[in-house]
From Swiss-Prot:
InterPro entries reported for this sequence: Helicase_ATP-bd (IPR014001), Helicase_C-like (IPR001650), Helicase_RapA (IPR023949), P-loop_NTPase (IPR027417), RapA_C (IPR022737), SNF2-like_sf (IPR038718), SNF2/RAD54-like_C (IPR049730), SNF2_N (IPR000330)
Taxonomic path: Bacteria, Pseudomonadati, Pseudomonadota, Gammaproteobacteria, Enterobacterales
Positions of short motif DEAH box: 280-283
Gene of this entry: rapA
Top-rank taxon, per record: Bacteria
Organism: Escherichia coli O9:H4 (strain HS)
One example of a Gene Ontology biological process annotation: regulation of DNA-templated transcription
Protein name: RNA polymerase-associated protein RapA
NCBIfam families referenced in this protein's UniProt entry, alphabetically: PRK04914.1 (NF003426)
Length: 968
């Protein structure tokens, strides 16, 4: 095309320069000025990488003065264009705008504009964009969205609770599973769903101080949720950045002590507009009707301000009725306002539980029993279902299940309380204790004697703590460099045990980090034993590396030496041998230690080895834990209660372990108390609640469907393609692991989620569970979500041109592949994507407007096409521009029908589902007061807003590909 002064052109290679103007032309070169950047470019006339900018009738253009005009006619005179049309601001018609006065800051965002302006993408980017649209739309429609992305085993009861609660509006529930059943994971799953769907954006987690890092690690490692830890220092820093320091972060963890210590701080927390509040160890919030504790009042104040509340607590049976009522009162003070009334209500649930047991037993029901069930459910048309349940037909079982669901919906606290017990959940290993009694070395005997004389004024508790760790008493006198490990028989025993069990992974836990470090040195220097160390002085990354080394099967560490605090929140269920080098001070810590291995999914029985020194507090404690509480070989829900009741007596025996008079009686009393309390807990078990919390076959089916999704090969292919196009290096490390590192030619200089040093990823859930240094990649992982955003929020792949070698079609035959997106705009919390996610509609049109998309599948067609370089592509586009315009108009006429069908289907689905949920809850409200008014109001409001948003839904062209047939 000839160049003329004043013409407007755009650079094919530097589109960011905007619109250029021809300012000089000679026989061989042309010079363009780009006014928006003030830069000049000199090109060869014969082969310049620039494209002539020509607008068509119907386009909207902007003048350099900022006003806009709709083009109605285009005139050309001496190679220069003049556009004639109507100004949009003044509605003046017949206005002429010469091309030299076009706005230079021109950005082509519509696919067709980019194509005609020569901004042609690589063919593989177009394919990636379409796949991104397709897979993204499919993922939103998955019924278990938000439950697949976490690095956890697929345990049915956890998935059941998370699926139920995570989909509610502002859930307010009590999670009261027995220890080891994964309350933290359930809470994390609920958070993950709520954050992913947009139902929540700001979350506050309040935990005891010692558990802050555990939660921080769990949320990051398992759910890719990056929380900020607020303490006094962080709070003071944040005060410089915002009036309310908590407004500086969306996801916050702080301790209960931190929250209640300062009145101003608590006010700031209450004013920070959280969507969800999570409180761990909520059973420690002391309450009585007359004197609630300050901690309880602080949480009560917060719970009044935050719409969603999750309380993690001990089981109701352990808490006692009053304490259990106090937790429920935090969730719904209007419903749970009278303790006496609550006690009476609980008694009335017994017949319901009996009715459920009766239905599940499968026996024929008498007429009286059928009548009782009918009255309890209170539905007018319940008779056919009752008859079906009592028949011999194939439908009897499903009818009984439906009746059980109806009963559970209508009675009890099942909407606000979830509690699973080990009795009701399969998959736990046995625990076997091996105690090793060892002589007390003379060096320790001397140190203990001297310490007793010098510390005569110490309290019994301090002396008891000292006596648990004789090596520390010895070091106090001999200095930190004292080589206690040279004579401590526990060290000798440990080395012997490890060398004779070389093939076993062994977890060794001791109270202090210093002990772990000293043991590592001894094992390495004396026996060449590979041991990783894990303690609170290490960063999270260092701990990850240590855990990963321990997890490696062949070349990894045989031993992981953990300190008490360092191992919090970490699970190593691939190991089944544990050595307690010393013993913790209370039963909760003991259970926490064993809980590192005793998890659902543990494949072997757990071997617990306790080498202890006679005539020390260890020998007292090992007997009390084992004979008094049976705490080594079984979980001990009674431990804390008994510990508190015999504390003073126990402390005296620990402080003076040589004075054992009456100790046998103490153990006997504790065992009797333990058995009585256990029987009491068992009797008080709420079977109705157990059935509801467990989820039964429904939960099993949910786990299986997610497991099937884990094997989705589309994800792996898409992710690799995505990483290639973004410019991320991939290095296959074997064992289903890949290392990703940034390259020098990335689409964006800093890709979120990819550190400078790179990351290790896996698509295999089992590998991710065993290797904490490998990130588990699913459709829900931030790396994939950020990649989808990067591709879909920009114009990557939105316009391209390809050649189709097909001798059955005439040379030069034109096809245009159009990707439309049907979507509705709405606030994220409406979760409109459940019904109408941005949905791609593909068309493949010929010159006559025939849509061949149904006959020609995308991937098959894509494999038949060949790429065209940008320069040749620009020439092709210019040659067929008028034809492409005509095909685009035919596409616009056809998309309306397809889009309307999608929108109508979404409206019907939304109306049906949301109306049904509202009707169900309104019906239940009459018989179950645990359904909150605000929940009903929210569902009705949500339904109205969803329907209004769907009424406003529309469509747009997202990408197009021009295909030209060739025979070469």
């Amino acid at each position: 095309m000839p160049f003329t002064l004043g013409q407007r052109w755009i650079s094919d290679t530097e589109s960011e320069l905007g619109l250029g103007t021809v300012v000089a032309v000679d026989a061989r070169t042309v010079t363009l000025l780009f006014p928006s950047t003030g830069e000049n470019r000199l090109y060869a006339r014969s082969d310049s990488p620039v494209t002539r900018v020509m607008f068509n009738p119907g386009d909207t253009i902007t003048s350099h003065d900022g006003w806009q005009m709709q083009v109605e006619e285009v005139k050309e005179e001496n190679g220069l264009l003049t556009y004639i049309g109507t100004r949009l601001d003044t509605e003046e018609s017949g206005v002429a705008l010469r091309e030299v006065f076009l706005d230079s800051k021109l950005v082509f965002s519509k696919p067709q504009d980019r194509l005609f302006a020569g901004q042609i993408d690589r063919m593989d980017r177009f394919a990636l964009r379409y796949r991104a649209r397709k897979y993204s739309s499919e993922q939103f429609r998955m019924p278990y969205s938000g439950l697949r992305g976490q690095r956890t085993s697929l345990i049915p009861h956890q998935l059941n609770i998370a699926h139920d609660v995570g989909r509610r509006h502002a859930p307010r529930v009590l999670l009261a599973d027995e220890v080891g059943l994964g309350k933290t994971i359930e809470a994390g799953m609920i958070l993950h769903q709520q954050l992913l769907s947009g139902a929540a954006e700001r979350v506050l987690i309040i935990v005891p101080e010692t558990l802050q890092h555990q939660w921080l690690v769990e949320m990051l490692r398992r759910f890719n949720l990056r929380f900020a830890l607020f303490d006094d220092e962080r709070y003071a820093e944040a005060q410089h950045d915002a009036y309310n320091p908590f407004d500086t972060e969306q996801l916050v963890i702080c301790s209960l002590d931190f929250a209640r210590r300062s009145k101003q701080r608590l006010e700031h927390l209450c004013e920070a507009e959280w969507d969800l509040l999570v409180v761990d160890e909520a059973h420690h919030l002391v309450w009585s009707e007359d004197a609630p504790s300050r901690e309880y009042q602080a949480i009560e104040q917060l719970a009044e301000h935050v719409p969603g509340v999750l309380l993690l607590t001990a089981t109701p049976e352990q808490l006692g009725m009053e304490s259990h009522f106090a937790r429920l009162r935090l969730l719904d003070p209007n419903r749970f306002h009278d303790f006496a009334q609550f006690v009476e209500e609980q008694k009335n649930y017994r017949p319901v539980a009996d009715a459920v047991a009766m239905l599940l037993a499968g026996n024929k029901l008498s007429n009286d029993e059928l009548n009782m069930l009918g009255e309890m459910i209170g539905e007018q048309d319940i008779e056919p279902l009752l008859q079906a349940a009592n028949s011999d037909s194939e439908d009897a079982q499903s009818a009984r299940q439906e009746l059980v669901s109806m009963l559970m919906d209508r009675h009890g606290t099942s909407r606000v309380l979830f509690r699973n017990t080990r009795n009701g959940v399969k998959g736990f290993p046995k625990r076997e204790l091996h105690t090793i009694k060892l002589p007390l070395p003379t060096q320790y005997q001397t140190a203990i004697k001297v310490s007793g004389i010098m510390g005569a004024r110490k309290s019994a508790e301090d002396r008891a703590r000292d006596m648990l760790y004789p090596e520390r008493i010895y070091q106090e006198f001999e200095g930190d460099n004292a080589t206690w490990w040279n004579f401590d028989p526990r060290v000798e025993w440990l080395m012997g045990y490890l060398t004779s069990h070389r093939s076993q992974k062994v977890l060794v836990i001791c109270a202090k980090a210093a002990t772990a470090l000293q043991l590592e040195q001894v094992l390495r220097e004396r026996e060449g034993i590979r041991a990783a160390v894990f303690h609170e002085g290490m960063s999270i990354i260092e701990r990850d590396r240590a855990a990963a080394w321990f997890a490696e099967e062949d070349t990894g560490a045989q031993v992981l030496l953990c300190s008490e605090i360092g191992s919090e929140g970490r699970n190593f269920q691939f190991a089944s041998h544990m050595v307690m080098f010393d013993l913790p001070f209370n039963p909760d810590l003991l259970e926490q230690r064993i809980g590192r291995l005793d998890r659902i999914g543990q494949a072997h029985d757990i071997q617990i080895h306790v080498p202890y020194l006679e005539k020390t507090a260890q020998s007292v404690l090992v007997r009390w834990y084992h004979e008094g509480l049976d705490a080594f070989e079984h979980t001990c829900p009674t431990g804390r209660t008994i510990y508190d009741s015999v504390y003073n007596g126990l402390i005296n025996y620990l402080a003076s372990p040589d004075q054992t008079e009456g100790f046998d009686d103490l153990i006997k009393n504790c065992r009797e108390q333990h058995e009585a309390l256990k029987a009491q807990l068992e009797q008080g078990r709420d079977r109705l609640l157990e059935i509801h919390s467990n989820g039964g076959e429904k939960a099993q089916a949910l786990a299986e469907s997610i497991e099937e999704q884990d094997d989705d090969t589309n994800l792996i292919a898409f992710a690799m393609n995505l990483f290639d196009i973004i410019g991320i290096n991939q290095d296959d490390r074997g064992d289903n692991m890949i290392v990703l590192t940034p390259s020098d030619h990335m689409l964006v200089p800093d890709f979120p989620g990819l550190s400078e040093d790179g990351i290790t990823i896996t698509f295999d859930r089992e590998v991710a569970l065993a290797r904490e240094d490998a990130q588990f990649i699913t459709w829900e992982h931030p790396l994939i979500r950020n990649g989808l955003d990067l591709i879909l929020s920009g114009d990557t792949g939105s316009s391209t041109i390809s050649l189709l070698k097909n001798k059955a079609l005439p040379v030069g035959t034109l096809l245009v592949e159009l990707i439309y997106v049907v979507e509705a705009q709405a606030p994220k919390q409406l979760q409109l994507n459940r019904f109408l996610p941005p949905t791609p509609v593909r068309m493949l049109l010929d010159k006559n407007g025939n849509n061949l998309a149904a006959q020609v599948e995308f991937e098959t067609f894509n494999r038949q096409l060949n790429a065209v370089n940008r320069h040749t592509g620009s020439k092709l586009v210019n040659a067929v521009q008028q034809d492409v315009h005509a095909i685009l108009q035919l596409g616009e006429a056809q998309i309306e029908k397809s889009a309307r069908a999608l929108i109508d289907a979404a409206r019907n689905e939304a109306d049906e589902k949301l109306s049904a949920e509202l009707s169900r809850l309104e019906a239940l409200r009459a018989v179950n007061p645990n359904i909150r008014d605000d929940e009903l109001t929210a569902i009705e409001s949500n339904r109205q807003q969803v329907m209004e948003s769907l009424d406003q839904a529309g469509w747009r062209l997202d990408a197009l590909r021009l295909i030209v047939v060739t025979h070469q």
